[in-house]
UniProtKB/Swiss-Prot annotation:
Domain notes: The N-terminal myosin motor-like domain (MMD) does not seem to have motor activity but is indispensable for polarized cell wall synthesis via binding to actin that ensures the proper localization to the hyphal tips and septation sites near actin structures.
SMART domains noted in UniProt: Cyt-b5, MYSc
Reaction(s) this enzyme catalyzes, per UniProt: [(1->4)-N-acetyl-beta-D-glucosaminyl](n) + UDP-N-acetyl-alpha-D-glucosamine = [(1->4)-N-acetyl-beta-D-glucosaminyl](n+1) + UDP + H(+)
Subunit structure: Binds F-actin via its N-terminal myosin motor-like domain (MMD). Interacts with kibesin kinA.
Cellular component per GO, a single term: plasma membrane
CDD domains listed in its UniProt record: MYSc_Myo17
EC top class named in words: transferase
Region (Actin-binding): 667-691
Protein's organism: Emericella nidulans (strain FGSC A4 / ATCC 38163 / CBS 112.46 / NRRL 194 / M139) (Aspergillus nidulans)
Enzyme Commission identifier(s): 2.4.1.16
Protein name: Chitin synthase csmA
Disruption phenotype: Severely inhibits hyphal growth in the presence of chitin-binding reagent, Calcofluor white or Congo red. Leads to morphological abnormalities in tip growth and septum formation. Also results in proliferation of intracellular new hyphae, called intrahyphal hyphae.
Amino acid sequence: MVGTLPAGHTPSHVQSSLPSLPAHLQSDTHLTAHLASRFHVGLPTARLSSHALISLNNYTSSSKGPDGGKEGSAMGETEDLARRAYTRLGARGENQAIVFLGESGAGKTTLRSHLLSSFLSFSSTPLSSKLSYAAFIFDTLTTTKSLTTPTASKAGLFLELQYDASSSVNPTLIGGKIIDHRLERSRIASVPTGERSFHVLYYLLAGTSAAEKAHLGLDSPIHVTTAGGRLSSADHKRWRYLGHPTQLKVGINDADGFQHFKTALRKLEFPRSEIAEICQILAAILHIGQLDFGSGQATLTGAEESGGYSHEGGETVTVVKNKDVLSIIAAFLGLGVGELEASFGYRTKTIHRERVTVMLDPKGARRSADELSRVLYSLLVAYVIENVNQRICAAEDSVANTVSIIDFPGFAQACSTGSTLDQLLNNAACESLYNFCLRSFFDRKADMLEREEVAVPATSYFDNTDAVRGLLKQGNGLLSILDDQTRRGRTDAQFVEAVRRRFENKNPAITAGASGSGNGYGMVSQNARSSFTVKHFAGEVDYSATGLLEENGEVISGDLMNLMKSTRSDFVRELFGQEALQTVAHPKEKTAIMQAQVSSKPLRMPSMARRKTSPASRLTFDATPAEDPYETESQTGSSAKNSSAKRKSGMLMGGMQCAAGQFLSSLDIVNKCLTSGNLNPYFVFCLKPNDRRIANQFDSKCVRTQIQTLGIAEISQRLRNADFSVFLPFAEFLGLAEVGNVVVGSDKEKSEVVLDEKRWPGNEARVGSTGVFLSERCWADLAKVGERVIPSFAAEDDGGDALLHPRTANYADSKVRLLNPSDHSPGAYIYGDESKQASNTSRDFDGRSDAGYSAFNSGDMFHNLETREQMLEKGNEKQMEEVDEVPVSGSRKRWMAIVWLLTFYIPTPAIRYIGRMKRKDIQIAWREKFAINLLIWLACAIAVFIIVGFPSLICPTQHVYSPAELSSHDGKDGHSSYTSIRGLVLDLGEFMDSHYPGIVPDSALKKYAGVDSTALFPVQVSALCLGKDGNVDPKVLLDYKPTNFSGSVTSTSSGDPNSVYHDFRYFRDDYRPDWYAEQMIYLRANYYKGWIGYSSEYLHTLASKSQNVASINGKIYDLTSYIAGGRRIQGREGDDTTGIDTDFMDSLVVDLFQQKAGEDITKYWEDLPLTPKLRVDMMDCLNNLFIVGHVDTRNSTQCQFARYFILAISVLICSVIVFKFFAALQFGKKNVPENLDKFIICQVPAYTEDEESLRRAIDSMARMQYDDKRKLLVVICDGMIIGQGNDRPTPRIVLDILGVPESVDPEPLSFESLGEGMKQHNMGKVYSGLYEVQGHIVPFLVVVKVGKPSEVSRPGNRGKRDSQMVLMRFLNRVHYNLPMSPMELEMHHHIRNIIGVNPTFYEFILQVDADTVVAPDAATRMVSSCLNDTRIIGVCGETSLTNAKTSAVTMIQVYEYYISHNLTKAFESLFGSITCLPGCFTMYRIRSAESGKPLFVSKEIVEAYSEIRVDTLHMKNLLHLGEDRYLTTLLLKHHPKFKTKYNFRAQAYTIAPESWTVFLSQRRRWINSTVHNLVELIPLQQLCGFCCFSMRFVVFIDLISTIIMPVTVAYIVYLIVWLVRDTSTIPWTSFLLLAAIYGLQAIIFIVRRKWEMIGWMIIYILAIPVYSLALPLYSFWHMDDFSWGNTRIITGEKGRKIVISDEGKFDPASIPKKRWEEYQAELWEAQTSRDDRSEISGISYGTKYHPATQSEYGFPGSRPMSQLELPRHMSRMSLAPSEMMSRHMDMELEDVNLPSDDAILSEIRDILRTADLMTVTKKNIKQELERRFGVNLDAKRPYINSATEAVLSGNL
């Protein structure tokens, strides 16, 4: 073609083929200028002959040329390319491949869609539509908006169109295949600024209806904490996984996109329910992004825990703050809310062949959630694409040829999502494709041209082979090294070093930078500059190696896999069961999935790669199976399922390939397909005209850079020299040329003649030795392919199938249109061109009517499916199985009857729906809790009644004042002013304020204070008494002569001058008959204080003095003056006074008072023969005229009883306080105990404590002043867990402290644990050795609970109680000689044979928490107490706080800790009955000193304490809240004759809860466990001993106080209110009681000089409302707050109680057991058969023994163990030497290879008898002894020295 268009005849821009340009225009600059000239006239394309298309993205329209049609447009050129490829496919039977190259934003995806549309338009099958939909679905799931383009592809695409070549004219499209490579998963959780995540997520948010949004939870207000800490509200719809809210509106019609996506799935025959499930998973992914994590305290006790660690403190855990969002995710994933939340809080890793659970902080939980979202999206994409392929892919055997469209994401200079791995793999793919491009143009025909003896001028070009080999070479390329280092568990620094060693001075394309460092536990101290550099064809790129290996592993933790196994969603189960998810099973337990990985390799291979046999010209495999796993598949069958299974199994055996390795394999396959001999490649170079996406702007510098990068000028130059695309043998060539016999000569000569006739240029046609080389143009001309008719189905046929045509285009085309979409394109929504959107009807996509389609698209796709609530309830249900049947005890039945009696009125549905308690056992527990609370409140009410109500009931309150008491209210010395009128006591002081001082001054009134003022108020008799006949003459007067009852001046005289002011009687001028009555009513209403009171005894005294006084109904009446004639008549002047009767009282009444004076005449009064009216009238007269007061019963018998009853209770309480006081003072002076020789075990349970706490605890135990040889330090690590803030698992921290090197790795052995179902089977590792610290050398034993292989989360973790049981059960079996589990046998072996002590020797066990530090003399003092009293079974010491001033919460605990020990425990200790021996610091007696009978580890204790079925409220409170108290209860119950004591001299220091939440949780546990242990203590024998004052009784009284603690605060408040309201009657008894409580306490700490306790006591008193009111009430109500687990009891047939569990049924036979004697015999057999086996197998410690200086134990100097390690002995079964074969025979601590003291003493005497005493030295004697005994006696030096001195001094 060169020279066919002479320059100057036409404009240069008309020339579309760059090689056709003159030679002087072949430079980068001139080619750029030529492209610019074409670009500016609307021709954005050019060609590289027939091989390649160059397209510039004009950012406007890809389908319009200069004249408005598609001629000259990118779309037109791609159609032409497709037509040429299709022609060659049909004419030559070659496979075709079109490879797209170019940067992101250059339009590759758009041109790819045009190309696919063109190919599909050549076929007339409905399959074409399906392939279009398939491509659309792929793009929807894998494309996104980037900074450079709105449709950036983020997955490599190998799209295969499959053809059948049976048609002689045109090949038939029979299928297709989408092979996706490496989706950019990191984008899901990390959306770069200014970009979007994958389009489908935005489609879902915008395209769902209101009903669908409600179901998916997309309509709820969204609150996300932004990076700045601000809350973003629903107004902005801030979705964390969708980037900035502005990305929701960027001109892409997401709503229509969702409808098209659903339609495409329906057209590909996805069921409606499956489409709904897909949408639910997408919604779940969005919601995962919304999860907000925070730190909390684990205040609920789990089903397998027993109160936690760190002295009952709360473990810091990560919690989800927005539980509503969490429930949506759980519903869609078919999981329980609780287990999903818990799964975010930890992650299990495999480190150094050990599974370790890392406790995650909120940031770690966020990363865990992001991992879940990435996994879900990756699996969803894999699932959808695989299902699409199943619907479009043809059978492999029927495929004759294929057209492959290869489009990988453009080269990336930087990793926008922060994923270095994605960037590296993407660039490696670009490098490989570019290298294939270069080889196709420069190298592919070179060999053949040479064989055919055709000379072609060489062309220089940039060769990227170094980079390709460095990156992609199998075995030692960069990706292979990365994969290998990842699988080996190397660090990033080691990887960079490996890269340096491999490429330094060997390959210039790759250089290694600096490296970081790490500790091997995933906690890397990173160096930000750890990196390597690759010189790519597009420029150098620096890749950070930080975190690269972990990212390459792409490990899905076993936690997530284990979680998903429990899903109730069939769709989620299918997602996690597909072939794209590769799993790693434990080598010893195939059902246990250790980890998994989403494959980075496509599930399918190209059809070319799957052929069993191929012609030599076709693709052949030459890679080894190890290098290419696909090779094995291609040879073993075509079934995808079978091949996948084989691929998985191969990986598991040889180690799973990581992302880089899988991607490398898939790239290798792509490369081999492309380089097969039967494939013709085309290339599409896509260029950006500028970097700013400005339409119709051409940036020459930008374009020239791309031309240089892609080597277009060199390719063009090469094509000017050799543009050969087809090689035809002479016969074929001549046949096509239709050369008959006209031309005479050889075939070669004939061919030369034809070429001469055709006048083709030399670079396009050459004759070789056996055939002819032609360009595609020349071949097409020769073969007359232009005469072939290629069908183009551009209109709908009669059948109604909407085959792709220009009007509707197709999905693959429209979806990714970068330029202006064609009119009415269904893809116009992406670019916001709403005027051109197609109407949303089914016929836009498919002519067939799809039943229910319109309802599906416009309505609710979730209609008739499960609601979210149903899914959530289903997810919370567990798959349970029956594991056991349990009988129900009689006491339980009786208790439940009481519970139902107390709670029958609360309906179960209310508990279920309002309380949200679905399970029946939890509902029953709530009823029990409520019933217990009712009983507790009843007890409190009874207590209140006894304190307040009972005295008032027996002795009602009387408002009476004796005359003497009235006299005291005289207004003097601050006293109140009271006076009385006719027995009525009034408040004179109050009255004075309202009196008229102008008439009578206040001073005059004050003299009436304290006296009887009756004489001041004369009465009008006729107004107050109707008399015996109903009428009394007003002239009748009654004289008032006060009786001086008390003998003092207590009344005023009748002649008082002030009485005239109140005298309104008849004879006065101012007659007011009712004045007195009115005034008395007024005074009583306003100033009433009570009545004058006289006792019954005093009334008798008065009667004896001729006083006519008696009482009726408690009121006292005095008729003395009346009977004595104190009546007279006085009228006004002139009145007639004759005939007036002054006896107005009935004679019967008068006689009664005379006869029964001084008595209670109520009965007689009622018996008087009076008419009812007369009786009423007489009573009125008595009440108004003769009443003098009330009977005073305050000193009566019943009132005395009430008073002394309360006093007795007070005395009892005071006596307890006094006893506590004396108990605290009973100890004598501080004595230093002697050295003791008892063997003790010091046990420390460890969970997630930090290294500092563990080291403090361990060191304090080791440094105790107790014989080191007789101490055994036992540390039990509860699970392989990395606590928050730690960099290693807790067991590793412990072992590092003790000096055990990492190379020591014993086999895990089985033992029984406390757990549900199969969790009863646990496994542990046993370590032992010597720990040296500050001159102490202490033997230690470490038990690490590692769990079974099937445990993927928190392996081995079973709780603190289980850690205690490990040692308790072991000692129990030792003492009873019972069969032991393998781990217990190993423990026995270590203690007996390595440490050298028979386990039965140990007599005491000291249990200390991991955050507790013990005093140096603690063990000595405790053992001393136990030796002084052999009946002691447990002894505790005083625990103080080390963090007293950390927070207000700790401050209020200091004094409480001090008093609870020095008063409460000291008092209980008096009676030998401490009810709670704290687990943080207690020593127990293992066995009886005399008989050796097991005590602490007796069968009864061990069986009761190891209770597994903890399914009732009572048992949970006993074993999950207060296991320490319950253990003490068991000791008291089963060993009632033994004592539990307190020794305040034994000191320990612990850490108290520092936050209110943890403090509340701790006290809730303590208080509730106290209540439930009280129930356990009630049936104990000897509860009431002599005089009800035995040890048990007083303790019982003490425990009762726990229940009524709230009453204490109420009583104190009552006293304060009493004191404020009435200072006259102070309850001295109560205040003396309070003073005694705190006064005696003060004496205690003053005597002990604890002066600081004064301040702490004040703080404690201020906190009394917290301790006595808030905590108990909170605790009682939260008695059922548990993590209930999944084991429960249900009612089966006929009322049977059946235990069901989701943990499976435990078979005790699964753990073999043997007695120690049997195990020893096997050890002997193993030793004697050592010659028949490998000496390495089965050895627990794989370390070599280096003899070193012997310690006194016969061990090498112990610390650090990395220098002097434990011996490795030839035992198959353990790490220890056998007793028979080892040189450490009988390694008892006292005589390990050393002579006894007696033998040494005997020899010393012998030496001294013959030695020269003037010259002999102790050193000489020691050396002589060593010579005689033949052993090193350094360990015996102190004894030798002291014995020598003793012999010489004559003491021995």
